[in-house]
Amino acid sequence: MPQVRVKAVGTDAATTSRVVLLEETSGAGRIVVVAVGEAEALAAAAALEGVQSARPGTHRLIGAVLRAAGRRLVRVRVHTLRDAVFHAELDLDDGTRIDSRTSDAVVLALLLDADIVVADAVLTVAGVDPSTVVVEGLGTGSGELEAFRRFLDTATPDDFDEPPR
């Protein structure tokens, strides 16, 4: 299975759905666009940007449970695309495989520094040319999310325009 990396988290310009872009790291560099929920998009963007909350969210909690059990996430495998839904599994260091939503699996991979691979068959069907993907970014790993959070921390009502009356 070819390895991919999270290229960006954002909003699909055509559908306004939150998406994660998985980019093939070798070969044609195809992009797999995975629709995700708002919470998973924010968690993925924060992980991509290296932003940590004061208290652990669900994904950090799962990582802590794995560590406490003496296990390590080795890789995330996106193995199937069925009825427009991507299916993934978490591969642990002891050979255990755990069924997972792809959105949760990607966030865990980002937080726990695990590889992400996508089945050739999935890439063949869902992989698109990078030049055809238009996404408004939430996070690209370039510090955008952290800069936005800093702005929100210091923003006052005067920083915003009055709403039209």
Regions found by a protein language model. Give the residues of each.
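Divalent-cation
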Residues: 1-165
